[in-house]
C-alpha cells in the first residue's frame, strides 16, 4: 500500500539521533514522518542513565544552542547534576547528569507529539525505495510504503544486531527489541561500505539488595545546581539523589579471569571491535592486569524504581560469572541482578562514504546519523541526528547544506573526524579531539551557534529572545568593567587588600583587576559592599546572572589566549574551505604519488581541509593540490572557493 501523503523528510529510528533529526526537520517547516518499531521506546536510554561528560556535555550544549531537545529533557528528567573538571580551565569543564529513564523518555515523547509538522508511525522499516541513485521512500514490515524527498537513517545498534551473554547469542537490536535484519540485508544490496562493531552494557541491580551503609556516597553539585539547557532552570529538576561508589578487588579479578574461556570476546565469537574508552570489565582486567582495583559507580535508574546501573562493569560474560563478580564487591555481597549484562554486535556504515552534510555520496537524499556511522554514545548520536535533520530539510528546501567548522563546534570536529578518518572502533568525543577547545566551551555554545540556528530555521522565538537578552547583557557588562575605573582614593587599601592581596598604586579598570590570577568576578564586584555589582534587573534573574558572570569572567581573563586562537584559525583557514570538484581527476596532478592519488580518489574529499586530514596525505601533497587548483582557476576549469561550510545557507 502506498500511503496517501508524501512527506518531505522520513526519519527511520526513534533513538537519540532519530528524535533530534525529526524535530529539527519539523522545526524547519518540513512535513516530517518518524518511523519507529515501537512508539513506547522513543528516546529510550538503552545503556547508562546519564547524559553529558567530558566532550559529550559540549555536544549536548551545542544541540541545545541549535534548538534540540536533549538538554531540556535532561533538565526535566535529571536526578543528579555535576560539573566535571570544575577546578580546571573553562575549556574542559563539562556538565554531567544522571537521568530518570522514565522522566527523560516522557520529556522527549512530549516534544515529539507536540511538534508541528511531525507525524509518528509505529512500524519497523524493512526496505528503502531507491530509484536510480536516489532514495524516495521507505517500506514497513506490513508493506506500507511511505514516499519522501529525503530519508534519514538512524538505526542505532539494530542493523543485524546480535546479543551475546557468554557463549549464548541471539538476534536483537537491544534487550527486548528485535533486530532490523531485513533492512540490514537491503542496505547490503546497495553495496555501501560497512563493517561490524560491538558495544555492551552491565547487569542491573535491585537497590533493595545493596548495602549502602558500607558504600561511599557521591552527591551532586548543590551550590549552584547546574542546568543543562540554556533555556533550563534548576527548579525544573525533579528530586535530586546521590550515586554510590564501590570497587572491584583481587577476588573480582580472579573470577573474571577464570571465566574468560567462556567469554565471547576472548573465544572469537564476537568479531566486532568494542569502544576503547568504555571497555568491558573483562577487557579492563586483561588490559590493565597490574591494577588491583577499579572504581564502580552505582547509579540510580530513576525515582520510581529500585534499579541501579553499576557503571564500570559492562560485560558479556556468562550469567553465573556475572553473579559471582557482582557478589565479590563491597556492598553487593547479596545483590540481586534484575537484568543480565550483554554485548551486542551490529552493522555500521563507513562514514567516509558520507558528505559533510551526512548525506550518502552514493545515494542522493539518504542521510545517516548516530551509531550507524560508527560512533558511541547518546550525545554523539543526538548531535549527528540534529545535523542530518537540518541538512535533509535544507535539501528539500533547495538550499545549500550546512556543517559547522572544526573551529566553530565540537559537532564540526565530530563530523570532520568521521568523514575524513573513518573509524576502526566506536568513536567517542573528547575535548582533546578539538584543536580550538578554548573557543569551543560549554558556556559559549549559544554564542557560537544560536544565530546560525535562527538562520537555518531551527531556533524558535522564545530561545532567540532569551539568547539576545543574554548576548546584549554580556556585552554591556563587559564594557562596564572595561570603563569603570578605580584608584587609591576610590578603592582604599582596606577594601582592596581582601580581594587583590594588596592595595592599588594607580588607576585601574575593573577589567584589568579581573585579569589577575586570584581575582574572580564575584569577589571583584563584591568589593566595598557590592558597590560594583551587576545591575539589579539582571541580578534578579539568577540563571541569567550566573551565565553573564561566567561569560564575562572567561572573556576578560582569557582574552589574550582566545584572540591568539582566533588568529590561528584565520591563518589555518586560508585554504580550509577551498572546494575540490566531485569529479576531480587526481591522476592529473603532477607530483602526487600513486598512493595519495588512490586515497583521494577513494575518499573523495569535498574540500582541501578534508583532504589534509585523510591519513597519509602529506602537507606536500596538499600544496600540489592547491597549485593544480590555482592553475585550473586561471584556465577557468574549476571554481576557486565555495561558501564557508560554517555559514548558514
Swiss-Prot record:
Matches recorded under NCBIfam families: mnmG_gidA
This protein's name: tRNA uridine 5-carboxymethylaminomethyl modification enzyme MnmG
InterPro entries: FAD/NAD-bd_sf, GIDA_C_N, MnmG, MnmG-rel, MnmG-rel_CS, MnmG_C, MnmG_C_subdom, MnmG_C_subdom_sf
Alphabetical keyword list: Cytoplasm, FAD, Flavoprotein, NAD, tRNA processing
Gene for this chain: mnmG
Cytoplasm listed as a keyword: yes
Domain of life of the native organism: Bacteria
Function recorded in the entry: NAD-binding protein involved in the addition of a carboxymethylaminomethyl (cmnm) group at the wobble position (U34) of certain tRNAs, forming tRNA-cmnm(5)s(2)U34.
Molecular function terms, GO-annotated: flavin adenine dinucleotide binding
Cofactors: FAD
Amino acid at each position: 500500500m502506498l500511503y496517501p501523503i508524501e512527506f518531505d523528510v522520513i526519519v527511520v529510528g526513534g533513538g537519540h539521533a532519530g528524535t533530534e533529526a525529526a524535530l529539527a526537520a519539523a522545526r524547519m517547516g518540513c512535513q516530517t514522518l518518524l518511523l519507529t518499531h515501537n512508539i513506547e521506546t522513543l528516546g529510550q536510554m538503552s545503556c547508562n542513565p546519564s547524559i553529558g561528560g567530558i566532550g559529550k556535555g559540549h555536544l549536548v550544549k551545542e544541540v541545545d544552542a541549535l534548538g534540540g531537545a536533549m538538554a531540556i529533557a535532561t533538565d526535566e528528567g535529571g536526578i543528579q547534576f555535576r560539573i566535571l573538571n570544575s577546578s580546571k580551565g573553562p575549556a574542559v569543564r563539562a556538565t554531567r547528569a544522571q537521568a530518570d529513564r522514565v522522566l527523560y523518555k516522557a520529556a522527549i515523547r512530549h516534544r515529539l507529539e507536540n511538534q508541528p509538522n511531525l507525524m509518528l508511525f509505529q512500524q519497523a522499516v524493512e526496505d528503502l525505495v531507491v530509484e536510480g541513485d536516489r532514495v524516495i521512500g521507505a517500506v514497513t514490515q506490513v508493506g506500507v510504503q511511505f514516499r519522501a524527498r529525503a530519508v534519514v537513517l538512524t538505526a542505532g545498534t539494530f542493523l543485524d544486531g546480535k546479543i551475546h551473554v557468554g557463549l549464548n547469542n541471539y538476534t536483537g537490536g537491544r534487550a527486548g527489541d528485535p533486530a532490523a535484519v531485513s533492512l540490514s540485508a537491503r542496505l547490503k544490496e546497495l553495496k555501501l561500505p560497512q563493517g561490524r562493531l560491538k558495544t555492551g552494557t552491565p547487569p542491573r541491580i535491585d537497590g533493595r539488595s545493596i548495602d549502602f551503609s558500607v558504600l561511599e556516597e557521591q552527591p551532586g553539585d548543590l551550590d549552584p545546581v547546574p542546568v543543562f539547557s540554556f533555556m533550563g532552570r534548576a527548579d525544573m529538576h525533579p528530586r535530586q539523589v546521590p550515586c554510590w561508589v564501590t570497587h572491584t578487588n583481587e577476588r573480582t579479578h580472579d573470577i573474571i579471569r577464570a571465566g574468560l574461556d567462556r567469554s565471547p570476546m576472548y573465544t572469537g565469537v564476537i568479531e566486532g571491535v568494542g569502544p576503547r574508552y568504555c571497555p568491558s570489565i573483562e577487557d579492563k582486567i586483561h588490559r590493565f592486569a597490574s591494577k588491583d582495583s577499579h572504581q564502580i559507580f552505582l547509579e540510580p535508574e530513576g525515582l520510581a524504581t529500585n534499579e541501579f546501573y553499576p557503571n564500570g562493569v559492562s560485560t558479556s560474560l556468562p550469567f553465573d560469572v556475572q553473579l559471582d563478580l557482582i557478589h565479590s564487591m563491597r556492598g553487593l555481597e547479596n545483590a540481586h541482578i534484575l537484568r543480565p549484562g550483554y554485548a551486542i554486535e551490529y552493522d555500521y556504515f563507513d562514514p567516509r562514504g558520507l558528505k559533510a552534510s551526512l548525506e550518502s555520496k552514493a545515494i542522493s537524499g539518504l542521510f545517516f546519523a548516530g551509531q550507524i556511522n560508527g560512533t558511541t554514545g547518546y550525545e554523539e548520536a543526538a548531535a549527528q541526528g540534529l545535523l542530518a535533520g537540518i541538512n535533509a530539510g535544507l535539501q528539500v528546501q533547495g538550499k545549500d547544506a550546512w556543517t559547522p567548522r572544526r573551529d566553530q563546534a565540537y559537532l564540526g570536529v565530530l563530523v570532520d573526524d568521521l568523514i575524513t578518518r573513518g573509524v576502526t572502533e566506536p568513536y567517542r568525543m573528547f575535548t582533546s579531539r578539538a584543536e580550538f577547545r578554548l573557543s569551543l566551551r560549554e558556556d559559549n555554545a549559544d554564542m557560537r551557534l544560536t544565530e546560525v540556528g535562527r538562520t537555518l530555521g531551527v531556533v524558535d522565538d522564545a530561545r532567540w529572545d532569551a539568547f539576545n537578552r543574554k548576548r546584549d547583557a554580556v556585552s554591556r557588562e563587559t564594557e562596564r568593567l572595561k570603563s569603570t575605573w578605580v584608584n587609591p582614593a576610590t578603592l582604599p587599601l582596606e577594601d582592596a587588600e581582601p580581594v587583590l592581596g594588596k592595595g592599588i598604586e594607580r588607576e585601574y579598570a575593573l577589567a584589568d583587576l579581573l585579569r589577575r590570577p586570584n581575582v574572580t568576578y564575584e569577589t571583584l564586584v563584591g568589593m566595598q559592599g557590592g558597590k560594583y555589582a551587576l545591575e539589579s534587573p539582571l541580578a534578579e534573574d539568577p540563571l541569567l546572572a550566573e551565565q553573564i558572570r561566567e561569560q564575562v569572567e572567561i572573556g576578560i581573563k582569557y582574552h589574550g589566549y582566545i584572540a591568539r586562537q582566533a588568529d590561528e584559525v584565520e591563518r589555518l583557514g586560508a585554504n580550509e574551505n577551498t572546494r575540490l570538484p566531485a569529479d576531480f581527476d587526481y591522476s592529473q596532478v603532477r607530483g602526487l604519488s600513486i598512493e595519495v592519488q588512490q586515497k583521494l580518489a577513494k575518499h573523495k574529499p569535498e574540500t582541501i581541509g578534508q583532504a589534509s586530514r585523510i591519513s597519509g596525505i602529506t602537507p606536500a601533497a596538499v600544496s600540489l593540490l592547491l597549485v593544480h587548483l590555482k592553475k585550473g582557476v586561471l584556465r577557468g576549469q574549476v571554481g576557486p572557493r565555495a561558501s564557508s561550510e560554517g555559514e548558514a545557507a
